[in-house]
């Protein structure tokens, strides 16, 4: 998927970001979660908004199976006020989302992971090794897709298998990088 960021089989970079309440959230320690999904998203991108319900449904459904989800917004809030921490907090509902919504103000975490779009999903196994990277499913306009690629990756990992496909092209709005 490119020279920057991490590739399949590589360990997750460090992540310590504030959530919508200001509390710092980190990745689980190896072995603490059956799998971890780090999903780049935002408040204004039509692709991210179209996939939102599918991602949050998966987060709620897989929580009881030990899967941890984190949503990250790395957009430049100066140029895109809809993605400011205040706007993120106004949109966020923990019960509905099923995951924390994190603000990557410096964009350092997005760069370390190699995130490019909203959405852009990184699915890690229990040892925090990247096992799936890409889109939630094949069509942001078709809710019936139900985040099929994401769910397939999680089912494979929970069964001790490698996801197939392991990579799909992330489709969405580009991350709005700082100048």
What are these regions (language model features)?
Residues 1-158, 163-167, 174:
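Chalcogenol-based redox active-site neighborhoods
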